[in-house]
Regions:
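Extended, charge-enriched "interface" segments that sit outside catalytic cores
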Residues: 1-16, 301-306, 322
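Active-site-proximal helix-loop elements at catalytic-domain edges
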Residues: 1-7, 125-127, 192-195, 337-345
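Glycine-rich phosphate/diphosphate-binding loops that line cofactor/substrate pockets in enzymes
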Residues: 8-20, 76-91, 205-217, 276-281
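Glycine-rich phosphate-binding loops that contact phosphosugars or nucleotide phosphates
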Residues: 17-193, 329, 380, 384
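Structural beta-sheet core signal
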Residues: 24, 94-96, 127, 221, ...
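Active-site phosphate/pyrophosphate-binding segments
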Residues: 120-286, 371-393
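Helicase-primase coupling helices
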Residues: 255, 261-343
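C-terminal helical/tail subdomains of lipid-metabolizing enzymes
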Residues: 335, 341-393
Length: 393
């Protein structure tokens, strides 16, 4: 990041608190990491809190992650309702994120919002895109938007520590220095070539051997706690796009990869665990948890004739460990990555740990973990289908 961009980033603190709402527009890696950060540090009810409870930070919405007219229509209705309640134009910032500047879903969402919000909103735009080319770059120059560069060589699924994640973090008050310091700690701790001294390498080796020697063809990502649900979505993209490759680096057909399946504990212990526990032994479960919860409460519990008070977080933790043991007792594989507590530092460390482990496994498999040629196949077909549907204006 250049000094100029750092200056612009610092100014976002003030800009954020001048907004009624920020709408993050992106898909894939331009969406999933930010959704994960929002869920962890803001929670499901952020937009129901008062401005004081949000410490002056704006309402946050996500669009452009699907070509779904229903959800974007509902967002417009909600903002219009806020306009009537406040009896003034809303200050709304559109955070437009697309490396190519031509990604279909975000660009269509931006088009719809720009057209439909202008009557009752004061719109401003912050863009994150390629600084030298693309539709968004051209629009940013023409309209004098604040624009951040999406660096070359960083794929969307690896972009949470780049401008993509850092700019978004400013709008929710996340301490980005602590977030980056957590990533740096992992980077400095996980470079040994000895797996016994490098936990990211050790996990990569375990999963690689499980896949190649034990027939593991699926990885179930199972974080415990609602706030980590989107971490599962984020890691599923990282795993699928990085390791799911037809060719190795020498051009040989290998069809590498595991099917990523995202679920959440304890919710899915009451549905999917039946298959995990008694279905085919072709799965490895990846558990994610936090040892300490920032918010907790006491509940009365009775087990085995013993009644007393227990922390709800202890129930969550006990359920996870019971799941682990039941799987192990039946010879089924799992890994568990646990944070001590939920802070920007620890979340930064967690996400970078998965980056490194995935990269190490890609190297073991002899594949390129940093491209995604498979997604181009459907795009070519989709463009031809859409061209047949376009009606002349």
């Amino acid at each position: 990041m250049t000094d100029s961009e750092r200056d612009k980033l610092d100014k976002l603190d003030i800009l954020a608190k001048r907004q009624d709402a920020v709408i993050s527009i992106g898909i894939g890696g331009s969406y999933l990491g930010n959704q994960a950060l929002f869920d962890i540090f803001c929670g499901s009810y952020w937009n129901h809190f008062s401005s004081e409870e949000r410490k002056g930070y704006p309402l946050i919405y996500f669009v452009g992650q699907n070509a779904d007219s229903a959800s974007i229509t509902d967002l417009i209705k909600q903002l219009r309702r806020n306009f009537y309640q406040k009896k003034r134009k809303l200050k709304v910032l559109l955070l437009l994120i697309s490396k190519s500047g031509s990604t279909m879903e975000p660009m269509l969402a931006f088009q719809i919002l720009s057209r439909n919000l202008i009557d009752f909103c004061e719109l401003s735009v912050v863009a994150i895109t390629n600084q030298n080319k693309g539709q968004i770059h051209e629009l940013a120059e023409k309209n004098q938007w604040t624009c951040f560069n999406m660096p070359e060589g960083i794929g969307g699924r690896f972009s949470i520590f780049s401008q993509v994640g850092l700019v978004f973090s400013k709008f929710i008050g996340l301490d980005i220095k602590k977030f980056l310091s957590g990533a740096k700690m992992v980077e400095e701790s996980c470079w040994s070539e000895k797996w016994s001294e490098n936990p990211a390498l050790a996990m990569a080796a375990i999963k690689f051997i499980a896949m190649k020697e034990y027939g593991v063809s699926a990885e179930v990502i199972m974080p415990y706690g609602d706030k980590f649900r989107a971490v599962g979505w984020w890691y599923a993209q990282l795993l699928g796009e990085s390791l799911g490759k037809k060719l190795d680096i020498h051009g040989n057909i290998v069809h590498n990869g595991r099917i990523p399946v995202s679920c959440v504990g304890t919710t899915d212990m009451h549905s999917l665990t039946q298959e995990h526990q008694q279905g085919r032994k072709n799965k490895l479960l990846q558990f994610i948890s936090a040892q300490e919860q920032n918010k907790d409460m006491d509940v009365v519990c009775e087990e085995s004739g013993k009644q007393g008070v227990i922390k709800l977080s202890k129930v969550l933790s006990a359920a996870l460990h019971a799941n682990e043991k039941a799987l192990a007792d039946d010879g089924r594989m799992s890994c568990h990555v646990s944070m001590r507590t939920v802070t920007p530092f620890h979340v930064g460390a967690l996400m970078y740990f998965f980056f490194l482990s995935t990269a190490y496994e890609g190297a073991m498999a002899g594949i390129n973990s940093y491209d995604q040629p498979g997604v181009e196949d459907y795009k070519k077909i989709l463009h031809s289908y859409l061209s047949e549907c376009i009606e002349k204006v």
